[in-house]
Swiss-Prot record:
The keyword Nucleotide-binding does not apply. Pathway: Amino-acid biosynthesis; L-leucine biosynthesis; L-leucine from 3-methyl-2-oxobutanoate: step 2/4. It comes from the Archaea. Binds 1 [4Fe-4S] cluster per subunit. Its cofactor is [4Fe-4S] cluster. This is 3-isopropylmalate dehydratase large subunit. InterPro entries: Acnase/IPM_dHydase_lsu_aba_1/3, Acoase/IPM_deHydtase_lsu_aba, Aconitase_4Fe-4S_BS, Aconitase_4Fe-4S_dom, HAcnase/IPMdehydase_lsu_prok, Homoacnase/IPMdehydase_lsu, IPM_dehydratase_rel_enz, IPMI_cat. Catalyzes the isomerization between 2-isopropylmalate and 3-isopropylmalate, via the formation of 2-isopropylmaleate.
Length: 416
């Protein structure tokens, strides 16, 4: 019996043949904390008798949720974390870098075959480069910071094989919303989802990040794409690493195999209040919106902004709609700036913000009031996620977001 890519990663790290279902103590290659989860994780580290983190170069610290500090508590948390970073010799990506998951990948802090944990549920995004990456709680993170290892129950793998060519203005976000609707919010609980097939092979890294980012929305422990030439090209200049083969064996045991063909896939919208309620945009076309948010670790990359800008063209956004554009990182912001996208969005009526989580976390800025409707390219639409529990959040692609912002209502991007 062969092995899945996840089993191979754990086998390499543990030095023995590991199979799904086994509980192992595995060394980790990276541990990420941000300004919300970091303070508690650090306190847990100290409570466990921690004095020095296992490896300062393997600890990743970022500020992205409440930046610049929007409260006295946030400011004090930032000071606390900066002090910890200085004492421990940890490089801190401060308020000017961007959203944690985007920065981790841009800076080469996750690589094929590695095990990386983060005190944030969307850490699974790093699977886009072929890493096993998963979110953990602050207590586990305190342990990881001290010992550089964690107990894992090696997950089974669901293989999602994707084929076909996307229609115009249909892409990775539409795909993952449709997969979430198919599998369900808890249909892959504590499993890894392996994205594979010809469509994935042709997909750029931005699209792969979008897919892996939302694996958690199906309850998955991780999302992962086997590294290929797209992966190794992305890693160039980010990490000095010699390409190597890493993929599931043909005779590996999978918990389930699912196949999807994107040829007939329509633009998708996840309706309130669950991510797995994705439906074709036509079923909610014409729905009134008050705010459009283009950004987040799910869809705030340069490629996403290009997608939105192509729909926008020389048109204007509906003045009755508040449009927030928030690039996922400083690097993505600069690329958009140099390409003239920022000016185009501003002239169209959007507010372009500095890289951060923004409305996605529901506690910083860009919140919606009771009765208001937000259409967002982010990853969650739970009740109260972006403000009032009496507001509504719909999820969509950057193309659908831009088209809807132009029309002032949910709109099929193929019709703009």
């Amino acid at each position: 019996m062969g092995s899945t890519i996840v089993e191979k990663i754990f086998s390499r790290k543990c030095g023995s043949d590991i199979k799904a279902g086994e509980v192992v103590m595995a060394p980790i290659d990276g541990a990420m904390i941000h300004d919300i989860t970091g303070p508690l994780a650090i306190r847990k580290f100290y409570e466990m008798g921690g004095k020095q983190v296992f490896d300062p170069k393997s600890v990743i610290m970022l500020f992205d949720h409440q930046i610049p500090a929007d409260s006295l508590e946030a400011a004090e948390n930032h000071v606390f974390m900066r002090k910890f970073a200085a004492e421990q010799g940890i490089h801190n990506y401060d308020i000017n870098e961007g959203v944690c998951h985007q920065v981790v990948l841009e800076k080469g802090r996750a690589a094929p075959g590695e095990i990386v944990v983060g005190a944030d549920s969307h850490t699974c995004m790093y699977g886009a480069v072929g890493a096993f990456a998963t979110g953990i709680g602050s207590t586990d993170m305190g342990f990881a910071l001290k010992f550089g290892a964690l107990y894992f129950k090696v997950p089974e793998t669901v293989r999602a094989e994707i084929s076909g060519k996307f229609q115009k203005r249909v892409g990775a976000k539409d795909l993952i919303l449709s997969i979430a609707a198919d599998i369900g919010a808890d249909g892959a609980t504590y499993q890894a989802i392996e994205f594979t097939g010809k469509t994935i092979s042709k997909m750029d890294m931005a699209g792969r990040m979008t897919c892996c980012n939302m694996a958690i929305e199906m309850g998955a422990k991780a999302g992962i794409v086997p590294p290929d030439k797209v992966t190794w090209e992305y890693m160039k200049g980010r990490r000095k690493i010699t390409p190597f083969a890493l993929a599931s064996d043909d005779d590996a045991k999978f918990a389930e195999k699912r196949t999807y063909n994107v040829a007939d896939l329509e633009p998708q919208v996840a309706v309130p209040h669950n991510v797995d309620q994705g439906i074709p945009v036509g079923k909610v076309e014409g729905t009134h919106i008050d705010q459009v948010f283009i950004g987040s670790c799910t869809n705030g990359r340069y490629e996403d902004l290009v997608e939105a800008a192509e729909v926008l063209g020389k048109k204007k956004f509906d003045p009755k709609v508040r449009v927030l554009v928030i690039p996922a990182s400083r690097d993505e912001y600069l690329k958009a700036l140099e390409a003239g996208l920022v000016e185009r969005f501003v002239r169209a009526g959007a507010l372009v913000e500095a890289p951060c989580c923004g409305p996605c976390m529901g506690g910083s800025f860009g919140l919606i009031a009771a009765g208001e409707v937000s259409l967002a390219t982010s990853n969650r639409n739970f009740r109260g996620r972006q403000g009032s529990t009496e507001g509504k959040v719909y999820l969509c692609s950057p193309a659908t977001a831009a088209a809807s912002a132009i029309k002032g209502e949910i709109t099929d991007p193929r019709e703009v």
